[in-house]
Every structure is written in structure tokens, then in C-alpha cells.
Amino acid sequence: MHYLGRGPVVSVAVCNPCAQGVRYKNAMDPAANRLAPLLDRMVDYERLRPTEREWDLSGVERLLRRKHAAVPVRPAIQVAGSKGKGTTAAFLEAIGSAAGLRTGSYSSPHLITLCERIRIAGEPIRVECLQPVLAGLLDFAGDQPPTFFEAMTVAAVECFAQDQVDLAIYEVGLGGRFDATTAIDVDAAIVTRIELEHTDVLGDTIAAIAGEKAAVIRSGGLGLTATTGEALAVIRAHAERVGAELLVMGEDFGVHHIDWADDGARGLLSLPDGTRQQFFLPDAKAFELPALALAVAALSRLHSDLKLPLDPVPRPNLPCRFEVRTEADGGVLILDGAHTEDSLQAVVVEVQRRYPGTTPRVLTSLAAGKRWQEALSAVLPIADSFVVTELTGTPGEDPAKICAWLTEQGARSEVATDVASGLRKLREHPGPRLVVGSFYLAGAVRLLVDSHA
């Protein structure tokens, strides 16, 4: 395997798509069901989490450079980072759309339907549009089928070009250096925050992970970052090495004089051109402010003549990012895909700010190989009761193993056989009810709640 940041590429045998069996037929997602004959011809590393594969951009570059391939839309922005990249991409989409741009946004993972990954003007791509694009890519690839992520990435490029969007936004899936989105020409690359994540692939130090994500900043291009300390030093050194302009939050742009109220947050945004603008973000969460600053700074540089709507800021669609639902019994259900120590700490801060003095019950499941003990340790200061269930959509840690560890930490815990029973057990608690640990879990709970609304 090629461990990013740890050594040279080593050629290895990867799993043949046919050997994975039929994975999408009878899926809960109707779009995946319709696309199953195409999807089952691809390797899906999000589901397999294999220990061996070769990392490079040759496959996606081959698709992007094929004859009659679409010319990628410009301007385009790529968003990388351990924390906040999805929120930053969502702010780019929401503010750009409200300012009059027709946006195309590519993100992952999806919560309910894979069509969510490719959005045009805020709406998921229609399966009727996606199907012929994927079919064409697979026909071209022949006996060298792309991975699921590679195919969806190139499909996003094609769909944005066909629709003639004004702004393309690409969220990195994993890392940066060898992520499929890095094969696309962009006008700005954003690196949000860096933390220890995917250490088996990206490296086990902040410096190593920062080095992988810094690679999204192109030679002679524009980079923006909200990193600090060691991560910032690595990113700054990379930008200098490749001759890129780097804008740093807290130095070249930022958020100032924040005034919190029940209905949101008001303050000042400093922009790269030295100006300041007032903003009001309705229903603001603390973790959203760096994302807002990054998005506004990037848009102001790429569209200097565009009047950005900041008072109020248009709220982005952020499902399962501290999404609060009021249930039939009056209890509060909070859905969040946070699964790392830092992101869960941000959730804890928000719970304490909004619901002081309460003790939430937690429904969780975590992906295999994650630093799950460190992640759950962040939640223990506010919660002492947990329900642990199986993770669907990607390999997960054994719920019994997680429960045993929680018991050792002095918390009460029980295993639920599936997400539905886990939600029932969670609802036995008056609230708040907190769902964290995985976007797959949060999305599954969201689907259950919506289907019984």
C-alpha cells in the first residue's frame, strides 16, 4: 500500500469489483438501485476500507483527459481539511448562490442518496442526468474501471460543464495530494483545520497530515487556510516552495467582535483587500465562523466585483452538522456526523452553550480503524449514558467492544441491534438526545425520523 506521507508508491493487487458481489441492488437509496449495474462495476473504497491499494491520480486524469471530455468550469474552488471542509463548501455554495451565481458543488459522503454528492443550484443531480455520464465513463475505461469516488468526481466535472455553472466547488474526499479532486484545475484551494485522522493512510503526525493536505495548493495558485501552529508552518512552507499566494485566517482575513444572541451571531469579517464588512449569521454555531470567514475570503478574491450577502448571511444546508430536531414529545434530537476528537469537542461546546446544565444521552457508532477512544473521550465530560449500534455503509468498530470501553470509563452503555432500536432506546431519555460518531449513522437516523414525521 502507499501510505500517504510515508513513502513511495508500491504496486499491489486491489479487489476486483466483481469479487465484491452485488452491492447496490435493493439499496435503500432509489438512485443507487437504478444505477446498480453501473456502480457494481466500480471499486468502492468508502465501503470496503481495504488495507491495500495504490494511490495516484492516473486513473482520474485519464478520464478527465479523454477525447471529448468536458472542460472543467472556472472559476473553481477546492476545499480540503480535517475539520470544517463540508461546512466551508456549504457556505461557498449558499453565499455564491444568493449573490447570483449558479453553483455546482461536489461533496461526500452522502446521507440519503448518492445524488446529493453532485448539486447544481443547491439541488441534487437527477439520476436521469447522472446515469448516461457514468455509463460513458465506464465504457471509456473498459477493463480498467474507475473507483466509485473517481467516477463521481469526473461526473461532477461533466455535469457542471453541461449545465454551465458559474462556480464549481469540490470538497476533498480524503487527504489531498492523491484525492481525485486534486486532478481538477482550480483557482483557489482551501485548507480548513488539521487534526489527527485517517492516520493509517495520511500519517500519524499533524505535520504529515498537513503535508498531504497542503498539496492541494497548486504551483503559482491561491491558497487559503485556517490552520495554526505546526500545521500552518507546513502549509506555509509548501506555498513558498511552489510559489503560491497563501492567505491565512487571523493574518489576512478573519472574524472579529462576535456578539452572540439567541437568534444568531453578529460581528465583523475582515477581507483580504483590507476592508471589513458587518455580518449576521442566523442560528449560528461557533464552529461555523471559521468556515464562513474562509468562504467569504475566497469568494471576495475570485469575484471582487460581486456583492456578497452578509447581513444576513444565507444559511447553508448543513444536514447532520449540529442539526437540531424537536420531537413529538418535546425532546431535543441533535444529529451530527462528528467522528474525531476535535469535531466532537466542538459539538460538546455547542451543547453546553445551548443546553447548559443538561446531560444528553448519546447514540453512536464509529468506523473501524478510527481513533474512537480519543473521539468518545471528548463526549464523556457531558454524557454518562450511551447506546452503541452497528455502523451501516462502511466497516465499523464492534459495538460490544465500544460498550466495554465506555463501562471502563464509568459510563452506562448498551448495544442496540440496529439503528431503529438504537433510536428507540435513545428516546427513552427526556433529552437532549445526541447522535454522533458517523455521518452514516446520523444520515440513517435522519432518514428514520423523516420517514415517520
Placement of each model-derived feature along the sequence:
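Nucleotide phosphate-binding/pyrophosphate-handling subdomain across enzymes
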Residues: 75, 162, 167-170, 179-190, ...
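A glycine-rich beta-strand to alpha-helix segment
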Residues: 421-450
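Acidic, Mg2+-coordinating active-site environments of NTP-dependent enzymes
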Residues: 144, 151, 164-171, 186-279, ...
